[in-house]
């Protein structure tokens, strides 16, 4: 497992090749996550601070009061309790908008059109697009941001091809193309992260 110095060295080497990189978070330990943030900044790096559901809110306030215009959030995509995760995220966004509405937000593990539109994340990431070749599930894009997933046996009936026989690189390309179409649709419908929230929208964030 990489330690913070190894990760910092990696970011120094490749950081200029990406749009952004996040702090090395320690899930369940907000203090250790904050310490890693400080270490990386002391080394001349500018990682996105990471705030997780369950962390003490004082850490979010510390990040907001610091020189950070872009913050990442974890715990948003909790399939065990989606309602609670969404309520928490709504409170977070409301808090940020009140403090500084120009701060950009990144969501770990989120690709739901509804959540991306509601919270206006500036960016997001997810490994769900890999499910097709990780679990042999054929995904195809139905339009309007909707994906349908079918199992290997059903794929022969639906597409005339047993998906299990498709080479890995073929599954990779298909999944990449499918998810690209989905995200292009979401990009078209999501409000700009620079567009101010109306009061009625803020009131609905935690609902």
Feature-to-residue mapping (PLM):
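Alpha/beta catalytic cores of nucleotide-metabolism and tRNA/nucleoside-modifying enzymes
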Residues: 2-15, 22-25, 31-41, 90-105, ...
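Catalytic beta/alpha-barrel core
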Residues: 1-6, 10, 17-62, 68-85, ...
């Amino acid at each position: 497992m990489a330690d913070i110095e190894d990760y910092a060295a990696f970011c120094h080497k490749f950081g200029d090749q990406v749009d952004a990189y996040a702090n090395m978070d320690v899930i369940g330990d907000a203090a250790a996550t904050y310490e890693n943030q400080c270490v990386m900044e002391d080394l001349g790096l500018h990682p996105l601070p990471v705030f997780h559901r369950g962390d003490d809110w004082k850490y979010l306030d510390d990040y907001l009061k610091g020189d950070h215009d872009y913050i990442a959030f974890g715990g948003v995509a909790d399939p065990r309790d989606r309602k609670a995760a969404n309520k928490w995220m709504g409170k977070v966004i409301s808090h940020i908008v009140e403090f500084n509405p120009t701060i950009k937000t990144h969501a770990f593990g989120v690709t739901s059109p509804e959540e991306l539109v509601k919270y206006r994340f500036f960016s997001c990431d997810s490994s769900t697009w890999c499910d097709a070749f990780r679990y042999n599930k054929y995904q195809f894009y139905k339009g309007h941001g909707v994906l349908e997933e079918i199992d290997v046996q059903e794929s022969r009936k639906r597409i005339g091809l047993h998906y299990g026989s498709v080479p890995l690189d073929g599954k990779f390309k298909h999944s990449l193309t499918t998810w690209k179409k989905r995200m292009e649709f979401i990009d078209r419908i999501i409000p700009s992260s620079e567009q101010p929230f109306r009061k009625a929208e803020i009131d609905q964030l935690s609902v």
